[in-house]
From Swiss-Prot:
Keywords: Cytoplasm, Metal-binding, Nucleus, Zinc, Zinc-finger
Single Gene Ontology MF annotation: zinc ion binding
Gene giving rise to this polypeptide: fyv10
Organism of this sequence: Aspergillus terreus (strain NIH 2624 / FGSC A1156)
Domain CTLH: start-end pairs: 164-221
Protein name per its UniProtKB record: Protein fyv10
Length: 406
């Protein structure tokens, strides 16, 4: 009894390892929102305080007319009103982030009030988590509308990051279409954070603009490309000197060149590389996992079930097409086989098999006694015959063959 209770006891801390991004992202968004407020206040302070001091001194010294003083004060009031509107928008955004964080904390807190894995409340909590993981998978795969609809139907909009992934997909798609405007705007908004990034997204975007100017072959565009390189590429000379030298060499090669690395620089596939690079950079800045959470959740179970035969290049001579396609092994299924390919094999030090294994003509192996008992319970099998519980096929008992394990 004690062993059973121990095996079903819920360890909340282990479960929460998978759900760290659930709280990490709102924290990162709140931090960035606060930084935006700081920048706005600092920028306006740098303008308003000197302007106010200058206007006051000019008024006291009577070096400007009252109308000029009023105009200067009106300009400052207008700027402060603009600051107020921006601050109100940021405050509303902060309230949304805090409300979302509160819902997520409440969701995770429920786990600490569930004593056992057998508790019905755990099934309910797990269902919500599964819905979250599916929405995350759909968002990362580009099915944004379906993800939004599922989140609305399950009432988990505060538990998933819809807006973040929708913005990410929008910019990634614009890059695949050959547009850099949205991505460069995003880089400008996150300039400070990008300095700490391991990726060189802004440089790659500026380099692509340079390549597109040269691709035209127009003399005016070539002059513009050189000016573009001096303005946007030269600042990266310390970290990207090799790329900048290759970019300079690109001026001597036409777009249909076969010489590498210039052929690759002209290749349309570079846009897909930029799109993937943006997604990786975006996820890094927001502390999002590079892999879908559903894959991470499945990986432990896949590894526990995986055996060398699951990805073997050789199939058993006794196996046929029917036994392969109806396999009960989740690793061998078409849905999970590729996902499990790079997973480590399960570490089994002992094998657990029936004491009287037999093999049926279709290649499936069962314990003889249990198979006979199951066939009797079915009731629709003639005497002297057995029914495969997986495929439903019926065979004569004489067709069963003993299995010997070496």
């Amino acid at each position: 009894m004690a062993a059973e209770l121990t095996s079903t006891k819920l360890n909340a801390e282990n479960h929460l390892l998978l759900d760290q991004p659930l709280l990490r992202l709102p924290h990162e968004l709140a931090r960035r929102n606060f930084k935006s407020v700081q920048r706005l206040v600092e920028r306006e302070k740098e303008y308003v305080l000197p302007a106010l001091k200058e206007t006051a001194n000019a008024s006291l010294s009577q070096s400007q007319t009252p109308d000029q003083t009023l105009a200067a004060l009106d300009a400052m009031i207008s700027r402060m009103q603009g600051l107020k509107r921006k601050m109100e928008n940021l405050q509303q955004e902060e309230k949304k982030i805090h409300a979302q964080s509160r819902k997520r904390i409440q969701h995770l807190e429920c786990l600490h009030h569930i004593p056992s894995l057998a508790d019905v409340k755990y099934d309910q909590w797990s269902r919500i988590r599964l819905d979250r993981l599916i929405v995350d998978q759909m968002l990362r795969s580009g099915y944004t509308e379906s993800a939004q609809q599922l989140a609305q139907e399950k009432d988990i909009e505060d538990l998933v990051d819809l807006n973040v992934f929708i913005q990410c997909q929008r910019i990634a798609e614009s890059l695949r279409r050959g547009e850099t405007k949205d991505a460069l705007q995003w880089c400008n908004e996150n300039k400070a954070a990008l300095r700490k990034s391991q990726y060189n997204l802004e440089f790659e975007l500026r380099l692509q603009q340079y390549i597109e100017m040269i691709r035209t072959g127009d003399k005016g565009k070539l002059v513009e490309a050189r000016a573009h390189a001096r303005k946007y590429l030269t600042p990266f000379i310390e970290t990207q000197s090799a790329e900048i030298h290759r970019a300079a060499g690109l001026l001597a090669f036409p777009k249909d060149t076969k010489a590498e690395p210039y052929k690759s620089m002209y290749a349309p596939e570079r846009w897909h590389h930029l799109s993937d690079l943006f997604v990786r950079t975006h996820h890094e800045l927001l502390s999002l996992p590079s892999w879908p959470l559903l894959h991470i959740a499945l990986s432990a179970g896949l590894s526990a079930l995986k055996t060398p035969s699951c990805h073997s290049a050789y199939t058993s001579p006794s196996s046929n097409s029917l036994s392969t396609t109806t396999s009960v092994c989740p690793i061998c299924s078409t849905e999970l086989n590729e996902l499990a390919r790079n997973m480590p094999y399960a570490h089994h030090t002992k094998s657990y098999v029936e004491s009287d294994p037999i093999v049926l003509p279709n290649g499936r192996i069962y314990g003889q006694q249990r198979l006979l008992e199951m066939s009797k319970k079915v009731g629709c099998v003639e005497a002297g015959k057995v029914k495969d519980p997986t495929t439903g096929e019926v065979f004569d008992e004489s067709e069963m063959k003993k299995v010997y394990i070496m």
